Structures are given as C-alpha cells and as structure tokens.
Amino acid sequence: MSDGPIQPPKPAVVHEAHEVDTFHVPKAFHDKHPSGTHIKDIEEYKKLYEESIKSPDTFWARMARELLTFDKDFETTHHGSFENGDNAWFVEGRLNASFNCVDRHALKNPDKVAIIYEADEPNEGRKITYGELMREVSRVAWTLKERGVKKGDTVGIYLPMIPEAVIAFLACSRIGAVHSVVFAGFSSDSLRDRVLDASSKVIITSDEGKRGGKIIGTKKIVDEAMKQCPDVHTVLVYKRTGAEVPWTAGRDIWWHEEVEKYPNYLAPESVSSEDPLFLLYTSGSTGKPKGVMHTTAGYLLGAAMTGKYVFDIHDDDRYFCGGDVGWITGHTYVVYAPLLLGCATVVFESTPAYPNFSRYWDVIDKHDVTQFYVAPTALRLLKRAGDEHIHHKMHSLRILGSVGEPIAAEVWKWYFECVGKEEAHICDTYWQTETGSHVITPLGGITPTKPGSASLPFFGIEPAIIDPVSGEEIVGNDVEGVLAFKQPWPSMARTVWGAHKRYMDTYLNVYKGYYFTGDGAGRDHDGYYWIRGRVDDVVNVSGHRLSTAEIEAALLEHPSVAEAAVVGIADELTGQAVNAFVSLKEGKPTEQISKDLAMQVRKSIGPFAAPKAVFVVDDLPKTRSGKIMRRILRKILSGEEDSLGDTSTLSDPSVVDKIIETVHSARQK
C-alpha cells in the first residue's frame, strides 16, 4: 500500500555550505614550512578543544604559564561568571605587558628585528630591533612618568600608523598606565568625547600623518578637541612631517626633544593580572561610544595563543597585518600577538592602492612576509583592480588571513589562487573588539576550510545558536539564529569604562548565562559556523563597526533636520554602505543639503562614517508609537519593495510609496 507521495527533501537551513567546496591545507604549505605547525593535525585540535571546554582551568593555566612570563605566579585560574559579570583570570598573578612583548626577547637577542616600518613612501621605511625597541619604550615611559602619569591613569593616543604608535602602547603598559587609542581618522568631536570619557590627562599625537600620499592634520584635530578638554595638561607630539603646527606653550612638548633627556632603561612596573591594559571605544547601538576595557593577563594570553595557533607564528616569521592600531585588529594583531611571540611585525602606514595597486604585494616580496592579514574590503578593491598588479612570487606566504566581515566565496578563491598561488592556507577569522582575540577561526595549517565560513571555535570558546524569539538554545547542526557563547574565556572584555550596567545589558543580560555577540549565525551540517552579520543597529563598513544611532545623532545636529534614520545596505566594495533618510524642519530638498549632511557626519564622526547616499523625504515610516521602521527602508534600498511585509501598523502607510519614488528618482540621476 502506498504511503502517499514522497516528500521532497527539506532544503538546508545553512544553504551556503552546500554551494562551496571544502579546501584542505595545501601540500605546498607543509613543503615550505620551516619546522612544522604547533599542533599535528585536526585530531589534536579536537582533543585540545575538548580539554579546553571540559577542563578549562587546567587548560588555561597551562597555556598562560607556557606563553606568558609572570613576576608572581597565580593560584586561581578563573573566578566569576557571565551571570554576575565578574569574570577574572589568573587572579593572584603579577606581570608586565611591555616586559612580555619586548624585554624577554631583547635580553635573549637584542639585534632581532621587532618592527618593519613600511612608510607611506615606499623608500622611507626602517627596521627597529628588540634592543632598540626596549630603549625607545623605556625613554617614552620615563617621559610619561615625569609628566605625572601613574599606574591606572589613562593616556590618549591619536597617532598614524608609525612605529611610535607601537612604542606609545608599550610605554604606557611599562608603567601600568592604560592606553586609550583613538583612530587617527576620527574627527575632533569624536576624539574629544573619548578623551573626556576616559579622563585622559596626557595625549600622544604627531604633527601630521601621511596616508596614500595625503596629509592628515593630526595635531590640528587634537588642538580642536582640546578646546573642550581642560584637564589635559600634556600633549606629546612626534615630528612626522616637520610641518609648522599650532603650539600651546607649557602643554605641548616635542617627542624628540623630551625623550632625549631620559635614560635608556626603565624597569617595568609589575601589575596584577586583572589590572586594565587598555580602553578601546567601539560603536554601540545606543549611539554613545563605549570604552571597552581589557585587562592584562587574559588579553595577552588571547593574543599570544591565537597568534601561535591561528597564524602559526614561529620565531623567525615576518608577519604583516594591514589593520590600523586605532582598531582592535591593530591592537591585537599588529602590536601584541606578534611581539609577544617575538617575531617581526610590519607597521604599514600607507594604503593598498598607493603608489599603485601592487603595494601590498611589493611589501610581501620585499620582506619575505610569512603571514598576511587584511579585511575583505581591501581584497575586493584589489581583485577589482586587476590581476596584472600581481606579478610577484610571494612564495614566503604560509597564511592568508581575513578579518572584519565574512569573505565572499569568489574573493576567497581569488585570494587563494592569485595571491597565495594555491600554496598558503586561508584563515577567515571571526572575533570582536569585546572578545579581544579570535573566537571562531580555522587554525593555520590544520583546519579544512569552506569559503565564506569562519570554520570552528577556538580553544575555550563554546558557541551556542539561540532562537531570538524564544531565547532558547537551538541544538544540533544545520540551524541558524543569533550567536552567543556559553562559557567565559580569558581575553574577553571585563566591562565598559565607567558603565558596568551598560556592559551587562549589552552582552550578558540579553540571554542569561550567555555572552551575546550581536551577530546572527548559522551552524552547518558539519558544525562549521557561518556569520550572518549584525542583528542590532550597527553597520559594518570596510570591517569597521559604526553605530546607526551615532550617525543619526550627527545628522540631527544640522539645524535643518527634523528626523533621521540610517541603515546599512550591501555594497560591493565596502561590504555595507551607510545610507541616510532625513526629513527637514522646513523648506524643499536640494542637492546641496544632501552634500552638507554628508559633510556634517564627516566632521562629527570622521570621513569613514559619511553616508554614501542621503535621501531627503517628507516623512519617515513610523509605527503609531513613533518607532521608525528601519527594516522598511532597508528593503526599499535593496529593491525588495514587493516584500515589505505588513505596513498597516504604520501611522501613515502612504509615506512608503513616496520614499520609494524618492529613492528611484535619486538613482536615475
């Protein structure tokens, strides 16, 4: 008897996993490896991973003692919980970040190269050894100390991508001060807000910066910000270009004049494992940037471990991360990870397109770079520029890393074939400012990879896929939902500076007992993770997180604007692009007003946050309670007018057709 018609198989939830091949580590990777990977194979990863989840204290204690040098050993590996927001690691231990990054290598081999400075102009770079680095860090640390900086004080850093930025980080940590770096593309308003929030009294900057053949007026921006920062008593200025810059006597001091006064060595200050190492401000969905606080031992361990196992860093490697020190990628993977492991790190001041599109490949060949780490935005730009720019051997490359957003399959393949010559292993890494270091990632030379997937969890990371409606964990494979983590790990941020409740509400109270990432994700049939992007009001432009609320607040500062709504939509080059909708208090929309509003955002936040398009509309789609329905704006911009869903809850459904008309006519121009 028939059981009725045969049901067609259910389509896969994580369909991308069935649209790509699985790539194994190329044989050429192993053939050219100087000594072999740190772990044998995927089976050893699974064994270590299981230990890290089932016996985390044993696992992390062993790793900490192996990779970090403590002045005083710890007894308690971990204390606290997600529920209470009081996680602490290696509790009784004492150490110094600067000693771990510099002295222990300098004492062994002072002539070993620590920093390869690749200046904006290709012929202007230089190399700094670990011995020289220890001397420079000590002298800047003396300078800070003599200007009254004490352990626990915050120091603001607003520097371009020059070796002195790395020296400034380490000089702060040498005396137990907390560095608070602000990306040197942020506006004076953004800098002011961060300096005030962190209570920094000393700022380190340069006369100017250089990037892509252009000049950045860093000192001018600092001066503008300082007008509203009365507590700042010292601005230490590094001479990068030698340009004439405004000068405030008594407050401003030249780096080159000041550091000469001090000895070549300052003993590092021993700090507690849980003492703050740095603050880094990141965009939050409420709009006000939050100072994410990382502590010393746990953060350093995350950096060292991921450097060792994800990037397969060995002693004589020359490692090149194209990130800026103003973001977490630069903190962890330009400064801390490579220096903790004693290899050479490239500090790259320029852009991938200056003086031409072969700049990255020139650098890789020139210095025999072994690991290269960059955002998909740069890769998309270079792929589009054409393969004629890649006439380089680049046989030294073992690892090609990707950071900031998922990498599209066709870009992944181009990276593997054209850049890596099918000899290097691609590591598409997922992590956040708040996680401190990689959390879902392949291990270099070990993990089979799927283009577009971040692969498998790093040691100690236990991911959970949560149903956003019920708040329950979804078990099994081929599922999707929001991504959370089930147990603490050493490099996670401990708090938001001066706002612990905000930290709890953003990360730990959303789903009790879990750390909430704010990202959607799928777990495929093999247990591999696919990151879907933000589920809160944050857009990801060129791998940088920007708060829509912060951009909206900048637009509302313009006297003509009544209301503003900002959404991110897919962009071929930058991943997402900022698009803004505004309604005016009065008057007719003009092309000039759109330009003025984009300029307003540039001034208020920085050029990278400027909207790609500004649409002036009569009204925004709002619910009867006044909530702006950004979902509708997103769908209109994506050409999905046919699937807007139920618009009957809007206070005035007719505004939708008018917005569609505005968008269409703007795009036809």
Swiss-Prot record:
GO cellular component: cytosol
PROSITE patterns per UniProt: AMP_BINDING
Alphabetized UniProt keyword annotations: Acetoin catabolism, ATP-binding, Ligase, Nucleotide-binding
Xref: Pfam families: ACAS_N, AMP-binding, AMP-binding_C
Annotated protein name in UniProt: Acetyl-coenzyme A synthetase
Binding residues for ATP: 404-406, 428-433, 519, 534, 545
Gene Ontology molecular function, alphabetical: acetate-CoA ligase activity; AMP binding; ATP binding
EC number(s) on file: 6.2.1.1
GO terms of biological process kind: acetoin catabolic process; acetyl-CoA biosynthetic process from acetate; penicillin biosynthetic process
Class of this enzyme: ligase
Catalysed reaction equations from the record: acetate + ATP + CoA = acetyl-CoA + AMP + diphosphate
Chain sites annotated for binding CoA: 211-214, 329, 542, 602
Pathway: Ketone degradation; acetoin degradation; Antibiotic biosynthesis; penicillin biosynthesis
UniProt cross-references to InterPro entries, sorted A to Z: Ac_CoA_lig (IPR011904), ACAS_N (IPR032387), AMP-bd_C (IPR025110), AMP-bd_C_sf (IPR045851), AMP-binding_CS (IPR020845), AMP-dep_synth/lig_dom (IPR000873), ANL_N_sf (IPR042099)
Gene3D superfamilies membership: 3.30.300.30, N-terminal domain of ligase-like
Annotated family: Belongs to the ATP-dependent AMP-binding enzyme family.
Domain of life: Eukaryota
